[in-house]
Protein backbone atom coordinates (compact mmCIF):
# COMPACT_ATOMS: atom_id res chain seq x y z
CA UNK A 1 0.00 0.00 0.00
CA UNK A 2 1.03 3.68 -0.28
CA UNK A 3 3.21 5.36 2.34
CA UNK A 4 4.56 2.07 3.71
CA UNK A 5 8.08 2.35 5.13
CA UNK A 6 10.27 -0.77 5.01
CA UNK A 7 13.72 -0.14 6.43
CA UNK A 8 16.72 -1.86 7.96
CA UNK A 9 17.64 -5.50 7.36
CA UNK A 10 14.11 -6.69 6.69
CA UNK A 11 13.09 -9.84 4.82
CA UNK A 12 9.51 -10.21 3.59
CA UNK A 13 8.20 -13.53 2.27
CA UNK A 14 6.16 -14.19 -0.85
CA UNK A 15 2.52 -13.14 -1.09
CA UNK A 16 2.74 -11.01 2.04
CA UNK A 17 0.61 -7.87 1.77
CA UNK A 18 1.37 -4.63 3.63
CA UNK A 19 -1.21 -1.85 3.74
CA UNK A 20 -0.74 1.91 3.88
CA UNK A 21 1.22 3.76 6.56
CA UNK A 22 2.79 0.66 8.10
CA UNK A 23 6.33 0.99 9.52
CA UNK A 24 8.24 -2.25 9.00
CA UNK A 25 11.76 -2.94 10.26
CA UNK A 26 12.48 0.28 12.12
CA UNK A 27 15.06 0.50 14.92
CA UNK A 28 13.99 -1.27 18.13
CA UNK A 29 12.51 0.95 20.82
CA UNK A 30 15.08 -0.13 23.38
CA UNK A 31 17.52 2.25 25.05
CA UNK A 32 20.24 -0.40 24.88
CA UNK A 33 20.12 -0.40 21.08
CA UNK A 34 23.25 1.26 19.69
CA UNK A 35 22.93 0.88 15.94
CA UNK A 36 23.78 -2.82 15.69
CA UNK A 37 22.92 -4.71 12.50
CA UNK A 38 19.79 -6.57 13.59
CA UNK A 39 16.90 -7.84 11.49
CA UNK A 40 13.21 -8.47 11.00
CA UNK A 41 12.01 -11.58 9.18
CA UNK A 42 8.42 -11.91 7.94
CA UNK A 43 7.22 -15.16 6.37
CA UNK A 44 4.89 -15.94 3.49
CA UNK A 45 1.20 -15.16 3.00
CA UNK A 46 0.93 -12.75 5.90
CA UNK A 47 -1.43 -9.77 5.86
CA UNK A 48 -0.29 -6.59 7.62
CA UNK A 49 -2.94 -3.89 7.78
CA UNK A 50 -2.75 -0.11 8.12
CA UNK A 51 -0.49 1.67 10.63
CA UNK A 52 1.22 -1.44 12.00
CA UNK A 53 4.68 -0.99 13.55
CA UNK A 54 7.18 -3.87 13.63
CA UNK A 55 10.67 -3.41 15.08
CA UNK A 56 13.89 -5.26 14.36
CA UNK A 57 15.59 -7.29 17.09
CA UNK A 58 18.31 -6.34 19.54
CA UNK A 59 21.70 -7.94 20.10
CA UNK A 60 20.67 -8.73 23.67
CA UNK A 61 17.60 -10.61 22.41
CA UNK A 62 19.27 -12.62 19.66
CA UNK A 63 19.18 -9.96 16.95
CA UNK A 64 15.96 -11.04 15.23
CA UNK A 65 12.27 -10.30 15.30
CA UNK A 66 10.50 -13.16 13.49
CA UNK A 67 6.93 -13.28 12.18
CA UNK A 68 5.91 -16.59 10.61
CA UNK A 69 3.57 -17.59 7.78
CA UNK A 70 -0.14 -17.10 7.14
CA UNK A 71 -0.66 -14.55 9.88
CA UNK A 72 -3.51 -12.01 9.84
CA UNK A 73 -2.39 -8.81 11.54
CA UNK A 74 -4.98 -6.04 11.69
CA UNK A 75 -4.60 -2.27 11.85
CA UNK A 76 -2.42 -0.48 14.41
CA UNK A 77 -0.79 -3.62 15.81
CA UNK A 78 2.64 -3.16 17.43
CA UNK A 79 5.19 -5.99 17.47
CA UNK A 80 8.28 -4.98 19.44
CA UNK A 81 11.88 -6.08 19.19
CA UNK A 82 12.86 -9.74 19.52
CA UNK A 83 9.31 -11.09 19.35
CA UNK A 84 8.89 -14.49 17.73
CA UNK A 85 5.54 -15.34 16.17
CA UNK A 86 4.59 -18.71 14.72
CA UNK A 87 2.05 -19.37 11.95
CA UNK A 88 -1.69 -18.81 11.46
CA UNK A 89 -1.92 -16.19 14.21
CA UNK A 90 -4.61 -13.50 14.34
CA UNK A 91 -3.88 -10.17 16.01
CA UNK A 92 -6.84 -7.78 16.00
CA UNK A 93 -6.72 -3.98 15.92
CA UNK A 94 -4.39 -2.25 18.39
CA UNK A 95 -3.08 -5.45 19.98
CA UNK A 96 0.48 -4.89 21.19
CA UNK A 97 3.41 -7.13 22.02
CA UNK A 98 6.23 -5.83 24.19
CA UNK A 99 9.77 -7.03 23.59
CA UNK A 100 10.82 -10.69 23.62
CA UNK A 101 7.27 -12.09 23.46
CA UNK A 102 6.73 -15.52 21.87
CA UNK A 103 3.37 -16.34 20.26
CA UNK A 104 2.49 -19.92 19.30
CA UNK A 105 0.69 -21.15 16.18
CA UNK A 106 -3.04 -20.45 15.85
CA UNK A 107 -3.14 -18.05 18.82
CA UNK A 108 -5.73 -15.26 18.67
CA UNK A 109 -5.13 -11.89 20.32
CA UNK A 110 -8.24 -9.72 20.36
CA UNK A 111 -8.30 -5.98 19.90
CA UNK A 112 -6.43 -3.81 22.42
CA UNK A 113 -4.89 -6.82 24.15
CA UNK A 114 -1.51 -5.97 25.69
CA UNK A 115 1.21 -8.58 26.27
CA UNK A 116 4.04 -7.83 28.71
CA UNK A 117 7.65 -8.41 27.76
CA UNK A 118 9.09 -11.95 27.85
CA UNK A 119 5.65 -13.59 27.99
CA UNK A 120 4.93 -16.80 26.09
CA UNK A 121 1.50 -16.91 24.43
CA UNK A 122 0.67 -20.58 23.91
CA UNK A 123 -0.57 -22.17 20.70
CA UNK A 124 -4.36 -22.20 20.16
CA UNK A 125 -4.84 -19.75 23.05
CA UNK A 126 -7.38 -16.91 22.96
CA UNK A 127 -6.79 -13.51 24.54
CA UNK A 128 -10.02 -11.57 24.97
CA UNK A 129 -10.65 -7.92 24.09
CA UNK A 130 -8.56 -5.37 26.04
CA UNK A 131 -6.90 -7.99 28.23
CA UNK A 132 -3.70 -6.96 30.03
CA UNK A 133 -1.38 -9.96 30.14
CA UNK A 134 1.69 -9.89 32.37
CA UNK A 135 2.20 -13.66 32.68
CA UNK A 136 2.55 -16.38 30.07
CA UNK A 137 -0.56 -18.08 28.66
CA UNK A 138 -0.61 -21.90 28.37
CA UNK A 139 -1.72 -23.56 25.12
CA UNK A 140 -5.47 -23.84 24.47
CA UNK A 141 -6.41 -21.43 27.28
CA UNK A 142 -8.76 -18.45 27.02
CA UNK A 143 -7.75 -15.48 29.17
CA UNK A 144 -9.63 -12.28 29.88
CA UNK A 145 -9.54 -9.20 32.05
CA UNK A 146 -7.60 -6.06 32.89
CA UNK A 147 -5.46 -8.38 34.99
CA UNK A 148 -5.89 -11.40 32.75
CA UNK A 149 -7.15 -14.63 34.29
CA UNK A 150 -7.85 -18.04 32.81
CA UNK A 151 -11.47 -18.53 31.77
CA UNK A 152 -11.40 -22.03 30.29
CA UNK A 153 -10.43 -23.79 27.08
CA UNK A 154 -10.65 -22.17 23.64
CA UNK A 155 -13.05 -24.85 22.45
CA UNK A 156 -14.45 -22.87 19.54
CA UNK A 157 -10.98 -22.34 18.15
CA UNK A 158 -10.18 -26.04 18.48
CA UNK A 159 -13.37 -26.99 16.62
CA UNK A 160 -12.41 -24.65 13.79
CA UNK A 161 -8.96 -26.25 13.66
CA UNK A 162 -10.50 -29.71 13.21
CA UNK A 163 -10.10 -31.14 16.69
CA UNK A 164 -12.66 -33.89 17.27
CA UNK A 165 -14.87 -34.08 20.40
CA UNK A 166 -12.61 -36.66 22.08
CA UNK A 167 -9.52 -34.49 21.59
CA UNK A 168 -11.32 -31.43 22.95
CA UNK A 169 -12.49 -33.45 25.95
CA UNK A 170 -8.90 -34.47 26.70
CA UNK A 171 -7.77 -30.85 26.50
CA UNK A 172 -10.52 -29.94 28.96
CA UNK A 173 -9.36 -32.72 31.28
CA UNK A 174 -5.83 -31.34 31.14
CA UNK A 175 -7.16 -27.87 31.96
CA UNK A 176 -8.90 -29.25 35.05
CA UNK A 177 -5.68 -30.95 36.16
CA UNK A 178 -3.74 -27.71 35.91
CA UNK A 179 -6.38 -25.27 37.16
CA UNK A 180 -8.96 -27.05 39.31
CA UNK A 181 -7.38 -30.14 40.85
CA UNK A 182 -5.57 -28.35 43.66
CA UNK A 183 -2.38 -30.20 42.75
CA UNK A 184 1.00 -28.56 43.06
CA UNK A 185 2.53 -27.72 39.70
CA UNK A 186 5.01 -30.61 39.89
CA UNK A 187 2.19 -33.06 40.65
CA UNK A 188 0.03 -31.67 37.85
CA UNK A 189 2.88 -32.05 35.38
CA UNK A 190 3.29 -35.74 36.29
CA UNK A 191 -0.41 -36.33 35.68
CA UNK A 192 -0.29 -34.50 32.36
CA UNK A 193 2.68 -36.62 31.33
CA UNK A 194 0.66 -39.76 31.99
CA UNK A 195 -2.26 -38.41 29.97
CA UNK A 196 0.02 -37.50 27.06
CA UNK A 197 1.08 -41.14 26.65
CA UNK A 198 -2.29 -41.86 25.05
CA UNK A 199 -3.33 -38.39 23.89
CA UNK A 200 -0.86 -36.42 21.79
CA UNK A 201 -2.91 -33.23 22.09
CA UNK A 202 -1.77 -33.00 25.74
CA UNK A 203 1.89 -32.74 24.72
CA UNK A 204 1.82 -28.93 24.12
CA UNK A 205 0.91 -28.40 27.79
CA UNK A 206 4.04 -30.27 28.89
CA UNK A 207 6.27 -28.51 26.38
CA UNK A 208 4.94 -25.18 27.64
CA UNK A 209 5.67 -26.05 31.27
CA UNK A 210 9.17 -27.17 30.34
CA UNK A 211 10.11 -24.14 28.24
CA UNK A 212 8.33 -21.04 29.55
CA UNK A 213 10.68 -18.90 31.61
CA UNK A 214 8.07 -16.49 32.95
CA UNK A 215 5.36 -17.32 35.47
CA UNK A 216 2.09 -18.25 33.80
CA UNK A 217 -1.57 -17.44 34.38
CA UNK A 218 -2.95 -20.03 36.75
Language-model regions, residue ranges each:
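Structural signal for interior beta-strand "rungs" in well-ordered beta-sheet cores
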Residues: 1-149
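Terminal amphipathic alpha-helical/low-complexity segments used for targeting or macromolecular assembly
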Residues: 15, 21, 32, 37, ...
